[in-house]
Amino acid sequence: LSAMRHLYEGLYKLDANSEISLGQAASVDVSDDKLTWTFTLRDDITWSDGQPVTAQDFIYGFDNLAAQGGDYCTILSDVAESYEAPDDKTVVIKLKQPCAYLPSILAFPSTYPARQDYVEQYGDAYATDPDKSVYNGPYEMESWAHESEVVMKLRDDYYDADNIQVGTINWELITEESSALASFESGDYVYSDMCPDEEKPRMEGNGLVYTEGDNNYCVMFNLGENGNDVLKDENVRKALSLTIDRDRIMAIRGLNDEIGVTLVCRGYVNADGTDFVDYCDPWEDTS
């Protein structure tokens, strides 16, 4: 996902401070009932082959997302009643109900625009090599040694290129956390998203910045037809829950975790700015 944010850009984007701001959209108008969002695209946005980015590219991207049926395929359709492009510069999204986090959805890579000609030409091979896609983000892919390295270079025609300081990014593809950490500590890497849990307190103690994603960890029971009949007893599941020493798990991790009592973790707020965890009913008293 981090790589995609460099190669492509949605109606919204994450700025230098990881705050959501307008990306390919120059402006947005929200109706009084907060159900209709009308985006006007920037005049200076192009694909890496020089063609202008159009509203239809976004509509095609939305449609293609739903048609693929993969991860996040309903991330937009869950909240959107419809979407359309009345002209090349306008994207209109109508919601089923007000959705304060729509900007977050539209900044997520799954809702980025897509060029129909490239998707149809390459099919399942689309975007598997640098020349099998075009890019509307700040960088374009220069090379991709599969399972080894991706090299990206800054696009001179990106609308905000003058404010980007890094001309080339090398992404090393590593699966071993210990190898990634060793390369980071030696200075070969300036950033890594892999770090063994047991090393995280030490890294923070050295003054380095470590950020944890919004994750929940839980035990899930199969209550379907093929599931264990014993586990379908609510009291059995509660008993198993009581055997989990949550405080001990947090102490072992040594991070700023908190006991999870909801499926949605802390950090998600409603339209009034109230955190969901603070106003929803917890599953169970875990004390």
Where are the model-predicted features located?
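N-terminal lobe/hinge region of extracytoplasmic solute-binding protein
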Residues: 1-32, 63, 134
